[in-house]
């Protein structure tokens, strides 16, 4: 993201410093010499961070099955509970970002994350404030130490194009980024 905050979570931390170093790859793919970045890839995890008063932008995987307006399998929701509860217990505000289905940058009512709110509240044990990305800043301002769920990020046209402006809008909402959605981490999305 090139974001102004620490990146923590399951997969990768954007390095604070980089320097290009030539590396001899031998005959790999017909390439004899290439340049790679030597980076400080030390891990930062939530349990080692000061979260008190911090807004923790947390990518989660809650792309769950729904029938007749109800979540039918809460497995993915159950998996995010420890992370969300840790943020809350540490005095932080978890701001959840997720996708649901494939709306391709269009608002599709049937793919709104609002349907997941009752299941999230039951699993986490606290109320969840649901908001659009456009109203997220105001919602977060009044949600200290509460859970905020932002509407389906794939409603945003730039999400699947890895739009830097969308990434910056998201980055501006948090002080810390946590990737708790390993299943979506490989995607080059905003």
Question: PLM features: what roles do these ranges have?
Answer:
Residues 6, 13, 24-38:
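Short, positively charged and aromatic/hydrophobic N-terminal segments
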Residues 2-18:
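Intrinsically disordered, low-complexity segments enriched in serine/proline and basic residues
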Residues 32, 36-190:
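Active-site loop-to-helix "anion-binding N-cap" substructures in soluble metabolic enzymes
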């Amino acid at each position: 993201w090139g974001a102004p905050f620490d990146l923590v979570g399951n997969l990768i931390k954007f390095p604070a410093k980089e320097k290009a170093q030539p590396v001899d790859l031998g005959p790999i793919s017909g390439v004899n010499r290439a340049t790679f970045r030597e980076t400080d890839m030390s891990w930062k995890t939530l349990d080692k961070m000061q979260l008190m008063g911090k807004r923790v932008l947390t990518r989660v995987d809650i792309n769950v099955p729904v029938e007749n307006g109800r979540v039918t399998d809460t497995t993915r929701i159950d998996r995010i509970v420890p992370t969300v509860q840790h943020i809350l217990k540490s005095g932080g505000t978890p701001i959840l970002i997720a996708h649901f289905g494939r709306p391709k940058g269009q608002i599709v009512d049937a793919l709104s994350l609002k349907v997941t709110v009752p299941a999230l509240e039951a699993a986490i044990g606290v109320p969840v404030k649901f908001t659009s990305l456009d109203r997220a800043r105001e919602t977060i301002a009044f949600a200290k130490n509460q859970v905020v769920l932002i509407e389906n990020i794939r409603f945003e046209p730039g999400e699947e194009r890895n739009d830097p402006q969308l990434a910056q809008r998201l980055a501006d909402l948090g002080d810390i980024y946590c990737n708790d959605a390993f299943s979506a981490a490989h995607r080059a999305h905003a």
